[in-house]
Design a protein with these regions (language model features):
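Acidic, surface-exposed loops and disordered segments
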Residues: 2-123
Length: 123
């Protein structure tokens, strides 16, 4: 989603309305599928947010086939309809050993233009 796309969908910035007007979706339209490319774009945008010491410790697995979602079923105790009807399940993991790759993570951030070299040099 680009900035213009986000602004088009943005309707309200009132914290109380957002907090108390939220919904928890329990059933999805089984006929609507989010493309793999769109899921990747959403993950890339979400991970643009800063993390502690900019280590980006998150890792993702996208289960989007019926077979892969079926493998998850024994692990889901509640709200199984969400797994059954969703376009995909996105599993989010935290890398507890990310500090071991700190230098590589910082170098990659500089290469991708996500971190200035002078900030990287201070790490």
């Amino acid at each position: 989603m680009k900035e213009e796309k986000m602004n088009k969908n943005f309707k309200n910035n009132d914290f109380s309305d957002i907090t108390f007007g939220r919904k928890s979706v329990r059933l999805y339209d089984e006929n609507y599928k989010i493309s793999h490319e769109e899921m990747l774009e959403m993950i890339q945008e979400a991970t643009a947010a800063p993390s502690s010491v900019n280590m980006q410790p998150w890792r993702f697995i996208i289960a989007e086939t019926e077979e892969s979602k079926a493998k998850l079923k024994p692990l889901i105790r509640f709200n199984t309809r969400q797994n059954d009807t969703s376009s995909a399940m996105i599993l989010i993991f935290g890398d507890m050993l990310n500090y071991e790759l700190g230098e590589e993570i910082y170098d990659q951030a500089v290469a991708e233009g996500k971190m200035p070299q002078e900030v990287r040099d201070q790490q």
